């Protein structure tokens, strides 16, 4: 019995015909001999069907020699044994592949990314995130299992790129791959600027202002607030005529902008404007004699 070394990949199987290792001087039918497994090293699983030996490498077994399988063969004249050395080699399964994950997140808030949606995995076992770091932008990123958490820094807006590394079930450092999460970070708009008000008639004034930076989002509208009544007036334009104001007093106005990340701080108030009623037209004078 002359052992032939066995090479088996991580998470893979090989079958070995033990008759090919036997040399019988009596030239008997080697497939009729009694073959047995006496000892199996760690890191592999072994089964024997007649003279066919199946060796399975465990997925997470590091590459390298694991020891030897002790087998015996008996042609009827007495059993002999031999040790067959086994070496775990790199898995032949394809590497994990990744596609860019693209998400939107509000500044200061945390989003989770399930990487199983953006990776192909040759094994049924979940991938594991080894590490994650922010390469572009400001914020933090961390992995837990196959889930990535991303938190843009409060006050930051724009593009943020997170780079992560994942490992498959083999735990083989040669099979580590890298992926990306591209984050569009939205923040609250800046406060509107240069708010002005002009009286336009009884109980009304026209309020205009400069549109602020949207900070990665899209401004959906504005709220104009009257200093006298506290009444809000909503508009989608950077200016509107406000009506229903109290006459005979001065009004100033502040403006708040809105986008999908939230509300801006209130603007600085406009200069006060006096709103008053126009008196009714006087009746024509008459002369009494």
Predicted features along the sequence, with ranges:
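Extracellular interdomain linkers/hinges and stalk-like, low-complexity segments
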Residues: 1-28, 68-123, 167-200, 208-211, ...
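Surface-exposed loops/turns
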Residues: 10, 63, 107, 154-158, ...
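Ser/Thr- and Asn-enriched, surface-exposed coil loops between beta-strands
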Residues: 12, 49-51, 107, 144-146, ...
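Surface-exposed or secretory-pathway low-complexity segments enriched in glycine-proline
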Residues: 15-16, 22-51, 113, 119-147, ...
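Extracellular/luminal low-complexity segments enriched in Ser/Thr/Pro
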Residues: 52-64, 147-157, 244
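Hydrophobic core positions of the immunoglobulin-like beta-sandwich fold
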Residues: 55, 150-152, 197, 240-243, ...
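Beta-strand-rich modules
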Residues: 64-76, 80, 155-170, 242-265
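Recognizes extended acidic, P/S/T-rich segments that occur
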Residues: 221-247
């Amino acid at each position: 019995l002359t052992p032939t070394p066995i090479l088996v990949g991580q998470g893979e199987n090989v079958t070995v015909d033990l008759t090919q290792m036997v040399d019988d001087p009596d030239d008997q039918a080697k497939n009729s001999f009694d073959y047995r497994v006496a000892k199996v090293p760690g890191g592999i699983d072994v089964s024997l069907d007649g003279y066919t030996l199946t060796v399975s490498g465990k997925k997470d077994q590091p590459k390298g020699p694991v020891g030897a399988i002790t087998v015996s063969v008996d042609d009827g004249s007495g059993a002999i044994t031999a040790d067959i050395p086994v070496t775990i080699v790199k898995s032949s399964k394809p590497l994990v592949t990744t596609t860019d994950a693209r998400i939107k997140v509000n500044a200061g808030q945390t989003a989770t990314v399930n990487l199983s949606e953006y990776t192909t995995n040759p094994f049924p076992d979940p991938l594991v995130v080894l590490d994650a770091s922010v390469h572009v932008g400001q914020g933090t990123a961390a992995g837990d299992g196959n889930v990535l958490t991303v938190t843009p820094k409060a006050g930051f807006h724009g593009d943020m790129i997170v780079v992560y590394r994942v490992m498959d079930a083999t735990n083989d450092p040669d099979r580590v791959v890298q992926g990306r999460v591209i984050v569009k970070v939205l923040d609250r708009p800046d406060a509107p600027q240069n708010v002005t008000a002009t009286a336009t008639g009884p109980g009304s004034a026209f309020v205009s202002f400069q549109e602020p930076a949207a900070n990665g989002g899209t401004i959906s509208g504005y709220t104009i607030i009257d200093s006298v009544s506290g009444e809000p007036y909503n508009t989608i334009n950077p200016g509107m005529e406000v009506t229903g104001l109290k006459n005979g007093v001065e009004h100033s106005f502040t403006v708040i902008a809105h986008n999908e990340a939230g509300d801006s701080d209130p603007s600085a108030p406009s200069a006060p404007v006096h709103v008053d009623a126009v008196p009714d037209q006087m009746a024509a004078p008459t002369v009494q004699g």
